[in-house]
Amino acid sequence: NPCLTFVTPTLLAGDRSQAHVVAHEIAHSWSGNLVTNLTWEHFWLNEGFTVFIERKIMHQLYGKSVFDFNAIGGLMELKETVDRLGATHPHTVLMPALEGGVDPDDVFSKVPYEKGFVFLVYLEHMASGRSDADADAANGTEAFAAFLKAHFERSKFGCVTSEGFRASYAEAFPEANEKVDWDTWLTAPGMPP
C-alpha cells in the first residue's frame, strides 16, 4: 500500500503536541508515497507539498492562527539555513543542480521544505486572482485545492518534475502563471523573492 504510514506510539501524545508530525506523515500519503519526485533536484515536490498539506491540516484542526504560527516558524528556520549557508550558496535554491557527483545528502536542509511551502502558498495566492494579502479566502484556496487534488490523481503511482508541475499549473491557471517568475523561484539562491 503506497499510502500506508507507520507512526510510533510516542508521537500520539495525549497533549497533541506532536499533531503536526502526524499530519506531516499523513500528508506524505500523497506527496512522496502516491506521487514522488523523479530525481533529487525535484525533492521540494515531496517535502514542500508535504509541509503545505500538513499546515492545511493543522489549519483545519486548530485555525488560521496555528497555520500562521507554523508558517512564521518555518520561515525563521529557512532564514537560519540561508544565513548559515550564505545567501548565494547553490544549496539554497529550490531546485538544486546535482550534476558532477553532488551527493543529495549534502544538499539536504530546510530549503525544500520551507521554501517549497512558501512557493506553494504564493502559487495559491496567485491562483486566487486577488491582489490583497487575504488571498486564503474561499475562491483561491478552493481552486488551488481542486488543482492539487487533480495533480495527485493525474500523477498517482508516478514521478513528477518541477517542469511538469509548472505545466500543470499553467494549464489550470494561465493568467496567474503569466505573473509567476518560475526561474527565480526554482533556481535563485537565498530567501524567496
Can you say where each PLM-predicted feature lies in the sequence?
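Hydrophobic alpha-helical and helix-loop surface patches within well-folded domains
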Residues: 1-193
